[in-house]
Amino acid sequence: MSDIKQLISIIIPVFNESESIGFLLDEVINVMSFHKFNFELIVVNDGSKDNTQQVLKQLTLKIKELSVISLRKNYGQTAAMSAGFDNSKGDIVITLDGDLQNDPNDIPILISEINNGYDLICGWRFDRKDKLINRKIPSKIANKLIANVTGLKLHDYGCSLKAFKKEIIDDIKLYGELHRFLPVLANIEGARIKEIKVNHRSRQYGTSTVSYTHLTLPTTFGV
C-alpha cells in the first residue's frame, strides 16, 4: 500500500519523442493511479526538432499532474535530467526514458525498495531488446570499465530507470555527461544502493538518439 502523503516525482527527459510520449504518460498514469501513489510528472523537452513540444502542450491540458520544462536547444541528457531534478518536489524521484523501452510497471517495485531503506535503486536491463552489435556490446564494455575504475560493481550503469531519495538528489550536482555516473556520485555521498532486474522493451517509434562514440575510454571518464 502506498503512503498517500508521500509525493513521487517522475522525470522523463525527451528528444524527438512525439510519437511515444503520449503512450508512455498513459502507462505511467495508469500504474501510479492503480497503486494510489501521489505523483507529479515532469517531462523535460531537450530541444526536440520534431513536434514533441506541440504534443506536450496538448497533454498538459489533459493531465493535471504534468509539467513541461522546455530547453532552448539539445543540451543532452545530463542537463535535461538536472533541470528535472531542480524542479522536482517529491520525496522519491524516479527517472526513465521517453522511448517506451523502460517499463512503468517496474516503478512500484523501485518505490518499495526505497521505502525499505535504500537511497538509490538502479534498474538492470538483464534481457535487453537492443541489437547486439549496436547496443549490447558497447554497453557491456562501458559498464565493465566504469565498475573497474570506480569500484562500484553494477551490471547496468546506462539504465535510465532509477529511483532516488530526494535528499540524495539534493547532494549531487550534475554537469557534462555525469548522469552516467549518478550511482558513483551517490555512493560517494554514502548512499545505500541496490540494483534490481527490470523489464526492457523494444523501441516502437523513432530511432535511438544515443551515440556510442562516448564509450571510448577518454570520453567515458571525462579525461
Please report, for each region that a protein language model flagged, where it lies by residue.
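Single conserved hydrophobic/aromatic residue that forms the stacking wall/gate
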Residues: 214-223
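Structured catalytic core of nucleotide-sugar glycosyltransferases
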Residues: 1-132
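Acceptor/aglycone-binding surface of glycosyltransferases and processive sugar-polymer synthases
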Residues: 69-73, 77-87, 101-185, 201-215
